């Protein structure tokens, strides 16, 4: 059976939100604690990629390793975070989750894992016609592709996907659970997510 690890991305600036999203309250804890807890039920190892400014606070909240982007790739967005996590944990597959998708379910991680196979480099959902590359699974062979992109100063997840053999998932499992894939980018979206939570 393939080994699978989790990489939680919490290295963004949260500029639209106005404060670090990883530390925002959610279900009697925080976004980052919630995402790690969801992942812990499905993967063997987890690492959190944190922004420098909040690393110590994140370390106090979660019981998994917390690291920053590798120094020479800092500031290069999600690709830098993903490859830093891949370097930290040696695994066959990596489940990527952002810290700002509070509705994500361990059921989704199970679906991702079921779809992985050696013929693919990545497994990515399509929600309402849009690819969601940060709620996806990547094989470790993708690491070299990321390095090549970063060396060319290319930071786009789309550029990575264009170089990969990707299995896209857009079936009923995904479309019936679009809430799993909602990102919270603004205070307004956060307020709405809390309302939706209280109405469940």
Curated annotation (Swiss-Prot):
It catalyses: Mo-molybdopterin + GTP + H(+) = Mo-molybdopterin guanine dinucleotide + diphosphate. GTP binds at residues 9-11, 21, 69, 100. Its EC number is 2.7.7.77. Keywords: Cytoplasm, GTP-binding, Magnesium, Metal-binding, Molybdenum cofactor biosynthesis, Nucleotide-binding, Transferase. GO terms for cellular component: cytoplasm. Mg(2+) binds at residue 100. One of its GO terms (biological process) is Mo-molybdopterin cofactor biosynthetic process. Belongs to the MobA family. The N-terminal domain determines nucleotide recognition and specific binding, while the C-terminal domain determines the specific binding to the target protein. This is Probable molybdenum cofactor guanylyltransferase. It comes from Bacillus mycoides (strain KBAB4) (Bacillus weihenstephanensis). The gene is mobA.
């Amino acid at each position: 059976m393939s080994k699978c690890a989790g990489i939680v991305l919490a290295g963004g600036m949260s500029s639209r939100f106005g404060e670090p999203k990883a530390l925002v309250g959610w279900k009697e804890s925080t976004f980052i604690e919630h995402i790690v807890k969801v992942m812990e039920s499905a993967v063997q190892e987890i690492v959190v990629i944190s922004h420098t400014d909040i690393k110590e606070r994140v370390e106090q909240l979660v019981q998994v390793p917390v690291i920053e982007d590798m120094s020479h790739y800092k500031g290069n967005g999600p690709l830098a975070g993903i490859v830093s996590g891949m370097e930290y944990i040696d695994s066959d597959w990596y489940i990527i989750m952002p810290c700002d998708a509070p509705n994500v379910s361990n059921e989704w991680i199970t679906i991702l894992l079921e779809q992985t196979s050696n013929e693919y480099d990545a497994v990515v959902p399509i929600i309402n016609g849009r690819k969601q590359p940060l709620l996806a699974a990547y094989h470790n062979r993708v690491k070299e592709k990321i390095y090549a992109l970063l060396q060319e100063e290319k930071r786009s997840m789309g550029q990575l996907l264009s170089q990969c053999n990707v299995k896209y998932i857009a079936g009923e499992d995904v479309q019936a659970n679009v809430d799993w894939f909602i990102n919270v980018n603004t205070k307004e979206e956060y307020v709405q997510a809390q309302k939706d939570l209280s109405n469940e």
